A protein has these predicted regions:
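A short, surface-exposed loop/turn module that caps and links secondary-structure elements
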Residues: 142-145
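N-terminal mature ectodomain segment of secretory-pathway/periplasmic proteins
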Residues: 14-102, 139
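Sec-dependent N-terminal signal peptides
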Residues: 1-5
């Protein structure tokens, strides 16, 4: 689909099959508990100039609700100590807070600002939420090959009225139900961004994680690449490690 093309829902779209595939995607990724990742964020502008940041992402699986995540920036110096806390929810809007050391205060991200850029990257705050079935309505579109991989193609429409997207087009590999690519369409229905998932590795003999996630903004020419350099599961994290009042002391 070319840039600026508008979303057209195919006549043969199958909502029931779309939901069934999405449910299977969710089911195969349950039970991992918690994880800690070390990551590099590479920001590149339209001219190709780049800058990098080092960060850690702590995640906690939550029964009967969305997952919790804590991102802590370690480098460079101007962002060191910045911490972002995300409490995902299945249906209602996520709770999100950002601690900025220079201001020595915790800022709540309002629902209306979830479509804004996270730390100057091409990822929006809403992109950092965990995948939850209640956040979307689903349509199965077709089977397709992408870079030699057999995939299901789904359209998922956000249920949150404050979402910056009218629709996301998702390619899931048919063997493991892993996302291969996602296209994001803006509020006017035009293609905004494409997210690509690469270098998958399996953990605990079940859970797949992409070690490279590349977000390309087609409207600005900017891109952000998240590369995971280390990842550990079941490290013993608890709910108390994901509280707003601990953001200023996040380590």
């Amino acid at each position: 689909m070319t840039i600026g093309a508008f979303v057209a829902f195919p006549a043969l779209a199958d909502p029931a099959k779309g939901l069934e595939i999405a449910e299977q995607r969710k089911a195969v990724d349950m039970g991992w508990g918690d994880s800690v990742a070390t990551m590099e964020m590479l920001l590149r502008n339209k001219q190709g100039e780049s800058s990098s940041r080092l960060m850690r992402l702590k995640s906690l699986e939550v029964d009967d609700d969305g997952d919790k995540g804590l991102t802590i920036f370690d480098e460079p110096r101007d962002v060191k100590g910045t911490a972002f806390l995300n409490h995902s929810h299945i249906t209602k809007s996520d709770d999100q807070w950002l601690y900025l050391p220079a201001l020595k205060r915790v800022k709540r991200i309002s629902s209306r600002n979830k479509s804004g850029p996270f730390m100057g990257s091409e990822f929006a705050y809403e992109d950092l939420s965990s995948f939850e079935l209640g956040k979307y309505t689903f349509n199965y579109i077709e089977d397709a090959k992408i870079e030699g991989v057999d995939t299901f193609v789904l359209e998922q429409v956000p249920t949150d009225k404050n979402s910056g997207y009218t629709m996301q087009k998702v390619w899931l590999d048919q063997q493991f139900y892993r996302p291969v690519q996602v296209e994001f369409y803006d509020r006017k229905g035009a293609l905004l961004k494409t997210l690509s998932f690469e270098d998958y590795k399996q953990y605990l003999n079940q859970y797949w994680r992409a070690h490279t996630m590349s977000m390309q903004n087609h409207q600005t020419g900017k891109s952000t690449v998240l590369t995971t350099t280390d990842l550990a599961f079941q490290t013993g994290l608890k709910d108390k490690d994901f509280q707003k009042n601990t953001l200023k002391r996040a380590k």
